[in-house]
Amino acid sequence: MDWDNIFSYNTAKIVTIKDRRLGGLHIIFMVLIIVYIVIYSTIYKKGYLLTETPVGSIRASLLAPNEFKDDSNFKYCDDNLIEYNFTKLECDYYDEAFVSFPVGDDVSFAVTTRVKTLDQVLNCSSKNPKCKYTTVSTRNVYVSDIEDFTILIDHTMFAPSSLIQYNSKQLKGYILDNDNNEIQINETINTVGIPGKPDILTIGKLLQLANIDLDGASSVNSTNSVRYDGVVALVFITYSNTFSYNTNNFKYVYSIQKVEDTEYGVPEAVILDNVSSRMYYNRHGIRLIFIQNGEIGSFNFQALLLTFVSGLGLLAISTVLVDQLAIRFLPERKTYSSHKFQITHGFSESRNKLRISQNEKDPLLLVETTKNNENNNNNDDYNDDDNEIFDDNNNGYQNIQNNNIIL
């Protein structure tokens, strides 16, 4: 059993092949990889930045117009003579305290467009499990002039890793129009993205940018209007400082997306004098759900190093590809393969000779060395034959001591 053969070790060998095809291809690969690492990954994709998704908070509030328009101007009101494709109802005027329900939090905001009011009494004891409220009267009305109510949106973003924090008044902002263009609004009432000013939009302007028509057909019931059933819309606020190469430039962008096949309704029970008398409100309207996202980047050496290391792996792949082309596909593949791969003879005999030489230097081990030499002489002829066979089989290969070969 030849242990040297079983536990053989493969090591890299440098061979210079003077072939313009292989050399040119390898240079092209190198140039492309360097361009990919430096130009694309590092500069264009900003591989030197550590990016994170910011978190934040949102405060939204509603304000009624200073002067309401007459309800005769609205075709959804029953005292308007203009034809309306959906159900007409009475129209009532309410202030922001009544229209904004439930009270907004940092993730959603609701605006009432229709409210059904039930005057209910309890004519029995509430301790009786079969006792139910009885409806005395019912009114179903639209909220007049809801499009002229204004909503103020104040939001703050925070990047936990880089500790970057800004309020919306400190940043430039934009809102996407119906053509997905980023626009700023600086009008008498409507303002969006102007540094130093709060973001204020009328409900009508907000719905217009979201492509939502309150007097269009509801996606839940086509016989009802959106004003009647209500609607849910997602308001995305996307923060970024990676849109340019100056990470000190920040911006945010509003985008509003209607949620299809949904309506919005919320009940409210208001106790009057006592529990036996209450007003029950069934509200329908517009629900806005705010979602803060985006990408905030800051310089990070580890991110830059990772970009370079991941790109350098491509260099090794390019070398493997050129090697495989040389030893498997080119007409000279056998010649190239013979120079690339070299098998050495076993080194057991060399180690034995070295051990004998060291033992001969020690007089105390001379007798044992002589015995070992006699035993080894019995195998000399066999080893010589082995070496001759090895030399024949490796015709075309270089000696292992020639580590650098130039063709």
Curated annotation (Swiss-Prot):
The lineage of its organism: Eukaryota, Amoebozoa, Evosea, Eumycetozoa, Dictyostelia. The chain crosses the membrane at residues 23-43, 301-321. Residues 1-22, 322-407 are cytoplasmic. This is P2X receptor D. Residues 44-300 are lumenal. PANTHER family: P2X PURINOCEPTOR (PTHR10125), P2X RECEPTOR A-RELATED (PTHR10125:SF27). The gene is p2xD. One of its GO terms (biological process) is calcium ion transmembrane transport. Disruption phenotype: Null cells are still capable of osmoregulation and do not show any noticeable differences in their sensitivity to hypotonic conditions. Quintuple p2xA/p2xB/p2xC/p2xD/p2xE null cells display slight delay in their osmoregulatory response, but are still capable of regulating their cell volume in water. Extracellular purinergic response to ATP persists in the quintuple null cells and p2xD single null strains with no alteration in the kinetics of the response, but the magnitude of the response is lower. It comes from the Eukaryota. P2X receptors are ligand-gated ion channels that play a role in intracellular calcium signaling. ATP does not evoke inward currents in p2xD. Not essential for osmoregulation. It holds the Pfam family P2X_receptor. GO terms for cellular component: contractile vacuolar membrane. Residues 381-391 have a biased composition (Acidic residues). Residues 371-394 are annotated as: Disordered. One of its GO terms (molecular function) is intracellularly ATP-gated calcium channel activity. It comes from Dictyostelium discoideum. Residues 283-296 are annotated as: Pore-forming motif. Keywords: Ion channel, Ion transport, Ligand-gated ion channel, Membrane, Receptor, Transmembrane, Transmembrane helix, Transport, Vacuole. It is found in: Contractile vacuole membrane. Belongs to the P2X receptor family.
